[in-house]
Design a protein with these regions (language model features):
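N-terminal ligand-binding/catalytic initiation module
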Residues: 1-214, 220, 224-227, 231-232, ...
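Catalytic cofactor-binding cores of redox enzymes
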Residues: 101-106, 112-113, 186, 192-199, ...
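Structural alpha-beta junctions
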Residues: 140-145, 260-261, 327-330, 383-390, ...
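General beta-strand structural signal in soluble alpha/beta enzymes
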Residues: 146-151, 169-170, 242, 265-266, ...
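Catalytic or ion-translocation cores adjacent to nucleophile or general acid/base/metal-coordination motifs
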Residues: 197-220, 224, 236-239, 245-303, ...
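Short, solvent-exposed amphipathic alpha-helical segments in soluble enzyme
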Residues: 257-259, 322-327, 348, 407-411, ...
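Core active-site phosphate/anionic-ligand binding loop and the adjoining beta-turn-alpha structural block
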Residues: 290-508
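C-terminal domain-closing interface element
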Residues: 295-304, 309-324, 328, 626-664
Length: 667
């Protein structure tokens, strides 16, 4: 067995006009670091090709800020094919090729030529040499081997066993002292760090559908909690305003329409607007602020949902609304503030093209403009909130970016960010207590056959597993999957997102595996977003509703990753910085290939409950009431196999009196 790149120099591929390209990420290496970066890239290449490619790679590094190895990119679009059209020694090896190609297809990827799937910087791997080697390894992978991927680099195949993971992935796991944006940028330029976001480097992205259900749930519950909307009604007659139409943020207009709202989403990049409009996820496009609000208000008057893309800057849009005293009910932001100085946030006052030019030629001025824009953004939101708007941070590091720009007023304690910010994140206020604390999270599956009829069958089977009368969340989820086909959510592979709790996920997984066994459908890939009950530790998002001090700890995400590996999930992944940026999160996920076997049934019975309830247990120990009741009920139902440690709750006056008495004695 030999896995290596060919001695033959590939033909340099052509670039399809109109396909988005990543901006220059910046070159800031020392001469010694530059030497190392070039050596690091050339170690993938047979020696006889070094002389040709050394200059080519240096040109990429100097002009793009990264060595992508464009010459090694396959020609054309990398659309996911049916699983049986891939080479492989085991089903898992073929299945993960489906997932990788889906992440990099023109329909899906934000910057396909730079291997960026979504979130401005989230990559499948660092370069096309890695891509080619990973594909080779997956083609020869057997069910007694595990492929290890470290920041995009395929370390190799290692002997394991059938019940072990077939692939183990880590991305950007920086040592603590160096776990910051500055040192990460150096490591990325040198070719040793890959920012995998969540499902980009974890090979589990299913297009913007993957976030639609979560956004739908967030908007509905925000309306119920903050606008007084009854549990059995939707957001008709209410206005939602936000920004971003990228790989994740592009879910906003679709989710808002499904929730019944009128929505205006600002986007500075016309190509992203065009993508969402052509997909039908945005109904109307305008560059006129007054027209955008007029269309929204007309739809609200007749209680019809509408989605409007405003081609322009969100700050301009909000300042117009404030000046005209236009009521905005729900307000958020989904610019890529985890990469705020890398192009993820376009400052007000300049065009998208000017932003890209500044990124390449005047980074200092760009960063200054970002800070000034964030100040203005903060001020206008503050005015709108004072007039009754409910603003929530959508977990994109937006408020942290404002704080880092020098606006200390946004911190809750007025000193630092350790106690959070003056406005809640959507997890803190909505998703945490209403969904995560019960175990509900973004479960998903991909029909590896590529057949739409398989997706229709699995939709029906999943719906049959849900009792809409059990909880309000179950009713919402039942309605979601019932209407999923009508809402035309698929972009890329035949896939579905469905929020479910621990029991729901297990029941659906077992049902699907039985369907595969009976020949009703082809093989299925199960997975989830890392943004889930147990998958991510981040005080700025997933664990922002943890108040016992452990919101800064990453034990849960690491234990979830390790536990899933021990229980035999087909793929396990652990990343740094998903969603909110390097140093601000530890996040993990899994992929589980359903082949219809009883072996898979046993893995599901062991792993699916663990994957969810480990997080519910942690939330329960943090004294979150809904997680405590969920854990207590779980102990009663599964007491023969499981037992979650439950907290005792002291009386508040006892705590206060004890502290007061002790401090008096000390004085």
């Amino acid at each position: 067995m030999e896995v290596r790149l060919s001695n033959q120099l590939p033909v340099y591929p052509s670039f399809v006009p109109g396909i988005r390209r990543a901006p220059d990420r910046g070159y800031s290496l020392t001469p010694a670091q530059t030497e190392t970066a070039l050596k690091n890239a050339l170690r993938y290449i047979p020696e006889e090709l070094h002389e040709v490619l050394a200059l080519e790679f240096m040109e990429e590094l100097l002009t793009r800020g990264r060595i992508y190895g464009y010459r090694y990119r396959p020609e054309g679009d990398l659309k996911a094919k049916p699983v049986d059209q891939y080479k492989g020694q085991c089903l898992e090896g073929k299945a993960f090729q489906v997932m990788i190609d889906n992440n990099l297809s023109f329909d899906i990827a934000l910057y396909p030529y730079e291997l960026v799937t979504y979130g401005e910087t989230g990559q499948v791997c660092q370069n096309w040499m890695q891509y080619r080697l990973i594909k080779q390894y997956l083609e020869i992978l057997t069910n007694e081997q595990t492929l290890v991927i470290e920041s995009g680099h395929p370390l190799g195949l290692f002997r394991s066993k059938p019940d072990a993971p077939r692939v183990i992935i880590t991305n950007s796991m920086m040592v603590g002292l160096f776990d910051n944006q500055k040192d990460w940028h150096i490591a990325a330029q040198m070719g040793v760090a890959n920012y995998g976001q969540m499902t980009a480097g974890g090979w589990m992205y299913i297009g913007p559908q993957g976030i639609v259900h979560g956004t739908f749930n967030t908007l509905l519950n925000a309306g119920r909690k903050k606008l007084g909307i009854p549990q059995d009604q939707d957001l008709r007659g209410h206005l939602f305003v936000s920004s971003g139409l990228g790989g994740m943020s592009g879910a906003q207009p679709k989710a808002a329409v499904i929730a019944g709202a009128a929505s205006i989403i600002a986007e500075v990049d016309s190509s992203r607007i065009q993508t969402r409009h052509s997909q039908g996820w945005v109904q109307h496009v305008t560059e006129d602020k007054a027209e955008a609000f007029r269309m929204a208000q007309e739809a609200m008057q007749v209680r019809e949902p509408i989605s409007i893309a405003y081609h322009g800057n969100i700050v301009d849009l909000l300042e117009f609304a404030e000046a005209q005293a236009i009521r905005i009910d729900l307000l958020s932001d989904q610019t890529s503030c985890h990469a705020v100085y890398e192009g993820g946030y376009c400052p007000v006052g300049i065009s998208f093209a000017e932003r890209t030019e500044l990124l390449s030629h005047d980074m200092d001025r760009f960063c200054l403009l970002v800070d000034q824009s964030l100040h203005r953004h903060f001020e206008v939101i503050k005015k709108l909130v004072a007039c009754g708007t409910y603003f929530f941070d959508y977990g994109n590091s937006f408020m942290k970016a404002i704080y880092d720009a020098g606006v200390k007023e946004i911190s809750r304690n007025g000193i630092d960010e350790k106690d959070g910010f003056i406005w809640p994140s959507y997890v803190e206020d909505i998703m945490g207590p209403e969904l995560f604390d019960y175990g509900y999270g973004p479960f998903r599956w991909v029909c590896l056959s590529g057949k739409h009829e398989d997706l229709v069958k699995t939709d029906q089977a999943a719906m049959d597993c849900i009792d809409p009368n059990r909880r309000g969340q179950d009713r919402d989820n039942y309605n979601w999957i019932r209407d999923a086909e009508t809402n035309r959510l698929v972009v890329g592979t035949e896939a579905r997102i469905l929020y479910q709790d621990a029991e729901g996920r297990l029941n659906i997984a077992l049902r699907f595996n039985r369907m595969v066994r009976n020949g009703e459908v082809g093989p299925i890939m199960l997975g989830r977003d890392h943004h889930d009950v147990s998958g991510t530790d981040s005080p700025f998002r997933e664990t922002s509703n943890i108040y016992d001090g452990s919101n800064v700890m990453a034990d849960m995400a690491v234990q979830c990753f390790a536990g899933n590996a021990a229980r035999g999930m087909s793929l396990v992944a652990l990343h740094n910085g998903g969603g909110v940026g390097i140093g601000k999160a530890i996040n993990g996920g899994f992929g589980m290939v359903l082949d219809g076997s009883e072996r898979v049934d046993e893995i599901l019975r062991s792993a699916m409950l663990w994957d969810v309830m480990g997080g519910v247990a942690r939330r329960s120990w943090a004294r979150n009431p809904n997680a405590m009741s969920t854990s207590a009920a779980f102990n009663e139902s599964y007491g023969d196999w499981y037992h979650i440690t439950l907290p005792f709750i002291p009386k508040e006056d006892l705590i206060q009196n004890s502290i007061r008495t002790s401090l008096k004695r000390k004085v």
